[in-house]
Amino acid sequence: MRAKKSLARPKKTVIFSNDFYSDMRADGMLYALIVRSPFSAGKINSIQLENQEPIPENYEIFTADDIPNQKFITTFGTRTEIFCTGEIKYKGEPVALIAGPDRKTVFELREKVKIILERKNQNQEESQDFFEERNFEKLPEQTESKKTSELKEPQETSEQKNSENLEETAAEREVLSGDAQSEFKNPENKIIEGIWKNSVTQHEIKETAGCFCCLKGENLHIFTAGRYITHIKDSVSRATGLEKSNIILNCTKKNNQNSNKIWMSSIFAAMASVAALKTGKPVLLSLEREDEINFVERATFVKVKNRAAVSKDGTIKAMDIEIQADTGYKNPLATEMLDRFTIAAAGIYSTENLRIRTKIFSSANPPSSVRLNRIDSQVFFALESQIQKISEETGFTPLEIRLKNLRNSNAKSKISKNPFELELGRAEDSMKAVCARSDFNRKYAVYKLAEKGRYETDENSPYSPPLRGIGMAAAFDGNGYLGTNFKNENFSLQVTMTDERKIVVNTAPPSQNIKEIWQKIIIDSLGIDKRSIQFNLDLSLAEASEKGIAAIQNDLMIGNISIKTHLLKKCLEAIKRKKDAVLPITVKKSIAPSKRNQWKEETFSGTPFFSTSFGTCVVEVEYDSCAFSEQVTGVFAVIDCGRIANPQAAETAAKQAIKKCLSTLVFGDSLKCQKIVVQFAQSDDEPKNLDSLIYSILPPAFCSATSQALALTVNELPLKTDSLFKIKENSEKNKKIKNQETQ
C-alpha cells in the first residue's frame, strides 16, 4: 500500500486504520535500522564506519546530537534517552539510527559501524566492531549486585564485571500482617522453605515494533501500532520542537502489546521523526525479529523465596515471602510490577501472619517487559508451587491443604485476615469440581505410591513405562487495579445516542463473548435493534488526545472488563432518563470516588481491584525416563469469570489460551495436549477476565505434576530441553556424595 493514500487532510490529529505500518511505502523512502551498543558500559567518543571511510551519498547516521530539542522521553516520571547521549547504560542501548534508500545496503553499513570509547587506561581497547557481538547471545537475566541481591544465576560477561552500573534497588515494598516471627519460632510448627524462579514469556510477534514517518506540508505523519497516543505525540513534539497540532498520528493495526511497547513506541517514533525532519524524506523504521525478542519482549526474571510455618493440622500459620525481580535499566513500569507482585503474593489464602518483601532491581540489562494482563502470573507460580510443597511435606492432599487455608469462600464474602480484601467467588466449589472432573484425588494417591522404588537400575530402559504425575493450582485475577498508572482512560466510558437513534459506545470489546454481552445489555435496556449498536474506540482515544488526557487503548489495561460493563449500564440508565431530550445525547460516566477509595494507596491496603475472577486447574504429565522428556496428557480447568453469553466461544478462547500457555513452558519446544477440558462456574456477575487466569494457574500445576512424576522438585520455568536430565543428574550426584559421607 502507498502511504500517500492515507494522507488526505485529516480533520483530527489522530486517525485509525486497518493497515500495517510496515506495509507503508512512499517515493524516496529511507529504510532505517537501530545501531545498538555492544558494550554494557563506557563513554562514547565517536561513532563512525570502519577505516574511517565516509558514509555513502544518500545515507545518514543520526545520533543524540541530531535531536534538536529534548533528547529523552518521560514515562510515569522515568526518563529514558532516545539515543545514548554519551555514557552507555546497558548492552544493546540504542546509540544511533542509520538510514538509506536501499535496505540491504543499510544492513551492510551497520555491520561496518565502529563505536569509539574514551580510553580509561592503556589496556582498554579503543573501539570494537559493532557486529563483533551483533549476534547477541541470550542476554543474561540479571547481573550481580553491588549489594546483597541474590539475583545472579547466569555468569557475568567480562563487560558486566567491569561495569559500574550494576544492580540497584529501584523500588521496594514491605507488607506486614500479624506476627510471623513468633510462629516460625514455635517448635510445634513445621517450617517449609522453597525457592522459585520464573522468566516465562510469550513471543506473539505478528509485526515487529517500529513506525513510518513522512512530511506533508507543515505536518508530520506518523504511522504506528503504538496506542499510548498522548505519550507518542508529546514525546515527538518535545524531541522535534513541532507543535502537537502538526503531528498527525495514524494508528495502524495493533500488534500484541507488552509493557515495553507502550512506551518504546514513543522512542521509535521520535527516532524516525528526527530522521524524517532532517532529510525531508519518508522514513520506515522496523525492528528485526531478534531485536524485538531481546530488547522489546525481554522477559522479567522473578525469584521468590517462600518460608512457611505449618501446624500439625495443616493450617498455614505464617508466611515470609521475599520477591526479587530484575526489570533492567530504569523500567518505567517498575512500580506497577512492584504493587501487583506484592498483592499476588498473598494469594487466595487466609494466612494470619504474613510478611511480604518485594524488591525491584534496576540493572545494566535492557528494560524487561511483562504482559500487563498477566503481570502477577510469575508470583502465583511461586505461591502455588509452595502450596504443593507444603502438601507433600505435611501429608495432606493438595486439595485438602488449599481448602483448609481458603478463608470465607462464599460467593460474596471477603478474605478478612489479610491486608488485601478480595472477592473469591465460588472458589471452594470450583476446586472441588476440577478435582472431581479430573479424578485428581485418586490419581494423586496412586502416583504418590508409585514414587516408592523409583530410580532402579532398569528405570532408563526403553521398555519401562512412563512415570506419571498430577498437579493442581488456583489463583485469582484482579479486574481493574485501582492503583494503576492508567487510571484516567481505564475508569471512564462514553455512550452516545445519535439523531438516528443509534448507540455509539466509545470502547472496543476485547472478545466476541464480551461484545455479545454488551449488545444484550443495550438491547434489554433501550429496546433498539442490534444493527443500531456501534462500538467505536477511535473516537474516545482521538478525543482524549485532543484534550491532553492520558489516552491509551483500554484493552491493554489490566482487567477493565468489569469496569466497562458497570459503566455501560450507568450510561444506559442516564440515556433512558433523557429519552425525551433532543438528540444526539452523549453521556460519560466514571467510577465513583467511593469505589476508588476502597483501595488505600497510602497504607497499601484495602480492596485493590474493582472485581476479581477465580480459576483452578489440574494438569497430568508423563515423564519418559529414557528420553528425559515430558508430555502433557491432560488439562482440566474450572473458571469463575462472571456471566458467559456464549459458552462455546468462551470455551474455545480458554482452550486457545491453554495451548498458547503450554507453548511457553519449555524453551525451544512447544508442549501440546490433546485432552483439554474447560468448565465455567454459573454466575450472574458482570463478565471478568478469562485468558489471563490461565497463565497464573497452568504453569504451577504443570510444574507440580512434573515434580511428582520425576520424584524431584522442579522449581524453575521455563524448562529447557535438557532440564529434567540435569535435575536427575544432580540428584544422583548428591545421593552419591551423601552415601560416601555416611560410609
Language-model segments: which ranges?
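Divalent-cation
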Residues: 434
